[in-house]
Curated annotation (Swiss-Prot):
Protein name per the record: Sodium channel protein Nach
Pfam families with a match to the protein in the record: ASC (PF00858)
Localisation: Membrane
Annotated family: Belongs to the amiloride-sensitive sodium channel (TC 1.A.6) family.
Gene3D superfamilies in alphabetical order: Acid-sensing ion channels like domains (2.60.470.10), YojJ-like (1.10.287.770)
Amino acid sequence: AAFAYFSGFMLDDARFSPAEIELMESVLLDNNLTMVQFVDRLRWDCHELLHRCRYHGDIMDCTQLFQLSKTFFGHCCSFNLRQHGLDFTAQAAAGGLDNGLSLILRYKDENYDALQSYSHGFKLLIQETDAFPSAHADCKFLGLNTESFATLRVVETFCSEAVKSLPISQRNCVFRHEFRLRYFSDYVYPNCELNCRAKNMVKLCGCHTYFFEFNRTKDRVCTFRDIPCLVDNFPDIITRRKKTQCNCPLTCEHFDYDVQMSNFALMLNMPVVDPFYTGIERNDAIVHIFLNSQVYRRVRVDLLSNMVTLVSHLGSAFSLFVGMSMLSLVEIIYYFTVILRRNYVQECRARQKLQTLHRRPNFGWPGDKNSNQQKSVFYIRGRN
């Protein structure tokens, strides 16, 4: 039941009574445990969740590919993640299903605790290597007794040398070595947002949550007694208000991942010749993660124009006036004054003449001097 209390470190709707908080706090004191040690005692290990792994077509020991890491959602088993305290494996993958990563996930504990979802399964986060796993990642759900195929479409954004030579104020982005963070060693935009949340936690509650503990600072790690403060200040912590927001410039060079998922029910009675599927069970979750193509798109950010280019363009325009004589200047003035005015006057006279020639006939009553009564006869009078 202790897992329900950890939602107080992440959500704003997890409120507990003082008696419940003191009960959990007494567990730490009686066992002489810190919050980080307490969480480590409750978590699963990767070998308990990863039943079988295959990479580049070879079945491998999952511990060679995955390491236990900290995320915004707690502890996770991470592949190719660069994080403090982990050995970065720098695994490379080619396109196609055979060159991707295949996993058989098995949840061995049948005594499910109270969940915040009506589904049982695993959460899959796909993101940049240097980013701290959080809600900024592309999140997918892997249900039990299913086989899922996750295809990745990669887009890389990089800058030319001309852009790199510009100051930050002109390119409106930063490179990873140009912006330092207090709680993270590598700068990417998601890390900056989370760094801002951690700073707000320390400012408002005097501590930060256990998953931000990387031994980079001496700030206190929040305990169960700090949950009411975290919940009450949740809008300010997650920067919903402008006064608690931080300056987080975009990164000039980054990778973006578009993930497309396909899910199918797991058929245990289907005969297969692939040894990867040997011994699968009813509640297993199988997932295949691979690049959809051998090539990927690279977007280059380049400099369209700078001061040198602008001056050269203006110089080309000014070169039209090189060798201009006084007579040419007089001709230009004469054209824009006398010639244009004379053409305008001639156009007005021509329009008046056309209106005169096409004027409508006039209708009038004839005058009769010998009769006092007005006659009901009219005539048409025209001009030659």
